[in-house]
């Protein structure tokens, strides 16, 4: 039984970390209520990056560090590329929000550790904001598109996590799709099951 200051605590776990955990602000709670869940490096190597800053998270998620406990795991890093048609149709189907052909995907907010919790989607028929971890994962996953992982390709209906970045794919000046690069599998709060095996 785990306790904190003499009281039994709630515990959370997930499959695989990207090299960083997050805290309960991911689910809209406060760290004051759950001070024992903290955002920190999984493997003890602090890269000196502020992962709530988009450019610094971009550097983090596109890199790999052999000291990370989950480094050898399949979903430590993953990426997928969806055409404008695929991502737009999948987004409308998953969210019930039709913004038309998606033109831009912008992360508006990341919580401690780097997980995205608010994403603005702009299309040729309007824009909308997706503002929860589970909704973001559902909105951009696609079971019909290959996802590249550390051990080959697979497919997921939902994104493995929101520890990810969105980039436009173009041919010349024409937008043809979006690449999603991410890491980890699960919400990222508490204990990584794969890291616990180390």
Residue positions per predicted region:
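Conserved, single-site charged/polar hotspot
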Residues: 1-198
């Amino acid at each position: 039984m785990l306790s904190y200051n003499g009281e039994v605590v709630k515990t959370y776990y997930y499959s695989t970390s990207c090299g960083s955990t997050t805290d309960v602000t991911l689910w809209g709670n406060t760290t004051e209520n759950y001070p024992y869940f903290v955002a920190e490096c999984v493997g003890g190597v602090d890269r000196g990056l502020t992962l709530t800053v988009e450019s610094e998270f971009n550097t983090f998620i596109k890199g790999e560090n052999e000291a990370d406990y989950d480094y050898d795991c399949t979903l430590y890093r993953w990426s997928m590329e969806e055409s404008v048609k695929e991502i737009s149709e999948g987004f409308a189907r998953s969210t019930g929000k039709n913004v038309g052909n998606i033109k831009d995907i912008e992360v508006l907010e990341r919580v401690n550790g780097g997980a995205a919790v608010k994403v603005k989607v702009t299309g040729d028929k309007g824009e909308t904001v997706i503002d929860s971890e589970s909704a973001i994962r559902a909105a951009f996953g696609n079971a019909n598109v290959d996802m590249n992982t550390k051990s080959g390709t697979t497919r997921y209906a939902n994104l493995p996590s929101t520890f990810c970045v969105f980039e436009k794919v173009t041919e010349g000046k024409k937008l043809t799709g979006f690449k999603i690069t991410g890491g980890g599998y699960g919400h990222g709060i508490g204990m990584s099951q794969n890291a616990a095996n180390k």
